[in-house]
Amino acid sequence: MSSPHRASTTQQLADLSLTEGEHDEGKPLSIDYLQGHEGLIEEVLKWSEHEQLDFMDKIVHRLSHYQLGKVDNFIRPMLQRDFISNLPAHLVELILFNVNSDSLKSCEEVSTSWRCALARGQHWKKLIEKNVRSDSLWWGLSEKRQWDKFLNISRDMSVRRICEKFNYDVNIKRDKLDQLILMHVFYSKLYPKIIRDIHNIDNNWKRGNYKMTRINCQSENSKGVYCLQYDDDKIVSGLRDNTIKIWDRKDYSCSRILSGHTGSVLCLQYDNRVIISGSSDATVRVWDVETGECIKTLIHHCEAVLHLRFANGIMVTCSKDRSIAVWDMVSPRDITIRRVLVGHRAAVNVVDFDDRYIVSASGDRTIKVWSMDTLEFVRTLAGHRRGIACLQYRGRLVVSGSSDNTIRLWDIHSGVCLRVLEGHEELVRCIRFDEKRIVSGAYDGKIKVWDLQAALDPRALSSEICLCSLVQHTGRVFRLQFDDFQIVSSSHDDTILIWDFLDAPPSGLPSSTNRATLPELPNQAAVARAQMLFEMAARREIERRDREVVEEPALRPRANAARRHNADIAAAAAAAEAARGAGDNDESSSEEDLDRVDQVNNPNVAGPAPPQPHNQNHRRRQPRPELPVRLMQEMAAFDNMRRQQNNMDHLGGGDVDEEMPDGGP
């Protein structure tokens, strides 16, 4: 049985021969041809497609120039056939639904019939809706720009809203095609505006261009905002003053304060029903989101609860007591412990989990992976040189931050470290990532944005990975979260900052709260400069004292002793300056062994003696009482700092060397 394609080819050959015969001869075709060509066609149809093409090639090469022109006139319309006009509507719909924006623009310019076909199918609207369903950035942008109300709705409602938007008379009756064209024009103009918004957002992230909103959380007893979570309506924060404060996103006022913890609120998470918080008072509390009532208090850990996560009826908590607790959540009031995981040799600072693994990080410098099904240990991820303060786990990727000032990316299945990111000058306290970016916050007061895809590419240079550094906090960054449009961060400086990359001013135009309006935190260069200035002042003071005692040989040893302390004084000045910038009595996280900090800060605990002067036979002399009081105070401060550092080194040093009065992170 001959195929339709072959029959069509034969018919074309016959028609072509008939046309040319009539033109060339000016008379009907011969009887011999009419009787013989049918048999020839039947014979050609028996050949394969390749044989037919070869046969046609041989014929074409034997045709005259005039005949080739006639063949071209016959074939060209067949190759340029208007399939939009000839195909059934449902096939046209299917074809146009799968083209991209550039192809849609080209289709609009083909002909009026094509433009009408695009209008009937509302293909610009469908392209926007498809992107909104598949891309979180499009979805979020549709809500923030409020064009989501023009999507996924009936045609009549679309026309009404579009007319209202452009101040058209809604009551004017329009025929169906006019309505479709009106909607088509609206969506075809909306699409490039969306693309422009997306391009601007991406550039703002890369350039560190943002609009800043600052929430002042300072109160009589507050000394830092340790944790937070946010949505479009509120920000929930946990503070060192033992409270949870909820902030309204409309006017950024404090709408509610939850009190009950007797220690710093170190971690929290909420959903549409409950807020669950962990504290340095070693308890976990469950709060009703609507009423703010504490409906459950969980007592299990014997020391501070440093982090918690819950999802799908499971909660995991970790503590300074070096353990991890897995809980079953039947309801907000029915939460029972399933199992305790033990294996870390220091405080467990952070946990994360999904339906496959629980991942925990500790001050013992390791990340441990546990099976969610069996709750058994699986493997250890080792590589950080000091304690680990933060991590996030998603898919196959684990990203961790440490007090060795680095960020590491790990493959959870193989345990391989994929990349080490360097750039922070102090402990990396908080870290989050999505499909595009890693955002980290550290004790140097900086927030850094990293390109995740570049970080995963072994060919990428280190200079290409860090997109920007954001400096607005005047204290240590404790916690942050982010989405496609913003970062929300909290700090020891008692503020919550909202970094808006959607409504940022154009690049180069300063904002009222742009980074240039606030001084940066003291960095190494500033500390070195302060040290140099104070050293010069101390040297001048000692030289003046030397001149005074030239005539008094008995006083010269005291001047020499002061000169020997010159370097110590300069270092003490730098340390004092840094301490004043960072704040006093701060809390920190990620201690390798939090107990040892108490030992260091406890004067009753014996430690190694401070280093002796180079000349062991020389007996240290007290400085002259006439020396400036400031010099004496800073010398004493330096001696105390050196003594504490020696004690820390003696105890094994590998972690965060900051004081933790509350035991919180």
From Swiss-Prot:
A cellular-component GO term for this protein: cytoplasmic SCF ubiquitin ligase complex
Keyword Transcription applies: no
Quaternary structure, from the entry: Part of a SCF (SKP1-cullin-F-box) protein ligase complex.
Localization per record: Cytoplasm
Bias type Acidic residues, positions: 584-595, 655-665
Biological process (GO), any one: neuron projection morphogenesis
WD repeat ranges, renumbered to this chain: 220-257, 260-299, 301-337, 343-380, 383-420, 423-460, 472-509
Region of interest called Disordered, as start-end residue ranges on this chain: 574-665
GO molecular function: beta-catenin binding; phosphatase binding; protein dimerization activity; ubiquitin-like ligase-substrate adaptor activity
Highest taxon above the source species: Eukaryota
Role, per record: Functions cell autonomously to negatively regulate cell cycle progression. Required to restrain cell proliferation in response to developmental cues. Probably recognizes and binds to some proteins and promotes their ubiquitination and degradation.
Protein name as catalogued: F-box/WD repeat-containing protein lin-23
UniProt cross-references to InterPro entries, sorted A to Z: Beta-TrCP_D, F-box-like_dom_sf, F-box_dom, G-protein_beta_WD-40_rep, WD-F-box_domain-protein, WD40/YVTN_repeat-like_dom_sf, WD40_repeat_CS, WD40_repeat_dom_sf
KW Nucleotide-binding (keyword) present: no
Predominant location category: cytoplasm
SMART domains assigned: Beta-TrCP_D (SM01028), FBOX (SM00256), WD40 (SM00320)
Keyword terms of this UniProt record: Cell cycle, Cell division, Cytoplasm, Developmental protein, Repeat, Ubl conjugation pathway, WD repeat
F-box domain location: 81-127
